[in-house]
Amino acid sequence: MRTENCLVELGTEELPPKALKSLGEAFATQFEAALSQADLSFDSVSWFAAPRRLAVYVSGLAEGQADKVVEKRGPAVSAAFDADGNPTKAAQGWARGNGIDVADAERLVTDKGEWLLHKAHVPGQSVAELLEGLINQAVSKLPIPKPMRWGNYNTQFIRPVHTLCVLYGSEVVNVSVLGLTSGRVVQGHRFHGEGRFELDHADNYASALEQQYVLADFEARKDKVRQQLEDAAKNLSLKPDYDEELLEEIASLVEWPVVLQAGFDKGFLEVPKEALIYTMKDDQKYVPLLDSDGALSNTFLFVTNIESHDASQVISGNEKVIRPRLADAEFFFNSDKKTTLESRLESLETVLFQKQLGTLKEKSERISALSAFIASQIDANETQAARAGLLAKTDLMSNMVMEFPDVQGVMGKYYALNDGEDAPVAEALYEQYMPRFAGDALPSSGVSASVALADKLDTLVGIFGIGQLPKGDKDPFALRRAAIGVLRIVTELSLPLDLETLVSKAIDVYGNKLTNAETQTQVVDFVLGRFNALLQDQAIAIDVIQAVAARRPTKPSDYLARVHAVDKFKALEEAEALAAANKRVANILAKQNVEVTATVNIDESLLAEDAEKALYVELKAAQKEVEIAVPSQDYTRILTTLATLRNVIDNFFDNVMVMADDEAVKHNRLALLSLLRQLFLTTADISILAKS
């Protein structure tokens, strides 16, 4: 069957830059799914996205569906003919519906009986017949939260659509989508080139647009922006300050990226660089430049959509745009410094944290008390932690943060230093929100860690305490992020903290505000659940996690040590047999209602068989090793020691009848198994590793 490459392009008005990439990806995903559902064969589907277009390109698309033979089963032969062998009404009706005579029907014989059968030849539809429905299906499934109407059309899309190009090879496929009839017209650059032009072949889409000053390939355009930024910064011996999010947003704003450099008055550098950077990156999509020491330069880069004949005018225009924004930041900074953070505490009384949980001032007081407690647990300065916790939210009332919300915490640090607060206190105001995202830095001191943990725990306990648990994708108080933050701080900084203790203290600090009696258990379980998800993301096997989770250790560092130990144990040659033995032991003890406890009494005088005597000796030796290793959380040592018991355990089960007739002997042997089980449970429930 003939194949050609196919292009579908929607020519639009400027698309929302933050949604452009996801729209392009979704268009390709949905169109590919539609092609597959229609049984149209193809090699691959790729996508293009630029500010004024969305397109999909299908390589090796078949010109139509393959013909099919569809088997249509009729009534059973016993019901298809009467006693004289004449077709019944059921058989005649079925045959008529399929356009055949009963005599022409074939027979389908199975072990359940015999039926009439018609094999219908169904010719496949051509790609020209199918494309309209497939395109409309894909477009209707794009992630568009707020579609809009335009002109006199009843159709809706994220932005008005003005051109529709659908080519199968060099042929136009006539379809109607979003009120437009397809053709071969494509929009070039708004200012360069010919404007609209006709595309001769699907294969020439990207190259023809490039001649018209449009880079339609999103990733290629992003790479070009990146390279120009790096080259321009290198020429200035500076480093561009951007991340992938900013880069993608810039690439979504331009069709033909051209990087230029501009500058601002050096006097603005007296303002904290974070505020200036926020203004440049978030408000204007400019790229700040840093020197080798990380200091901000008064030169910056910006990306335009044109190759200007007079670049100086474009540069001057952008400098005029940024100047008043920087002047605002300078004014806010200087005016804010006239008021101390401590004097802003009372104004926090006017801001609600949550209706049932009180104001931000009350939250600050709780954070202060909890920070001091945590500091006492990790040998940090309690006085500084309490002070930092009290001032943690005061910068929210400053003019700078009200204007530029993303600099909260950062400005708290600068204002605290201006007020003469201790350096660790100031740093804690900045680091209280860490980690803000996956891979973000962690608090750098015990004081900062105490405040960061206190803030997150106060939110977790408070929201759970009034019964507003996160459901599905809804997590308005970012409790999942808070839980992950707690876990990262405690584990990566190796802090000796117990979730039960932390949550209990946070509940106490709330006084009588909380109404959920299950808060303690629910918060600890929620955080541990996030821990399990994090560990799965790190490629830890689910059964390893479940084995540790069964013991419910609530010290995150202890939990992690157990997981790593079980993960190593699972790779040992003895692991499978020992897991199976643990499962067998657990089942025996459960059936006999024997509870595994820390203290197990075994009567040596009742040990009659050599195999049970040998097991007892080995278990007592292993018990001593376990007792030595537990305080240092050396679970790898524990499991390595217990792994040496494999042969003696196998020998016991091969030669000893646990359920002896003598009740005393039976209970003694059950006690022996209880000790074995207890030693393994010191680390995890190894029986969970046993294969079903």
UniProtKB/Swiss-Prot annotation:
Lineage: superkingdom: Bacteria
The entry's keywords: Aminoacyl-tRNA synthetase, ATP-binding, Cytoplasm, Ligase, Nucleotide-binding, Protein biosynthesis
Gene Ontology BP term (one): glycyl-tRNA aminoacylation
Annotated Gene Ontology cellular component terms: cytosol
Database matches in PROSITE patterns: AA_TRNA_LIGASE_II_GLYAB
Annotated TM spans: none
Gene Ontology MF terms: arginine-tRNA ligase activity; ATP binding; glycine-tRNA ligase activity
EC number: 6.1.1.14
Catalytic EC class: ligase
Primary localisation category: cytoplasm
Gene3D superfamilies: Isoleucyl-tRNA Synthetase, Domain 1
InterPro entries according to UniProt: DALR_anticod-bd, Gly-tRNA-synth_bsu, Gly-tRNA-synth_heterodimer, tRNAsynth_Ia_anticodon-bd
UniProt xrefs under PANTHER family: GLYCINE--TRNA LIGASE, CHLOROPLASTIC_MITOCHONDRIAL 2, GLYCYL-TRNA SYNTHETASE
Name this protein carries in UniProt: Glycine--tRNA ligase beta subunit
Organism in which the protein naturally occurs: Alteromonas mediterranea (strain DSM 17117 / CIP 110805 / LMG 28347 / Deep ecotype)
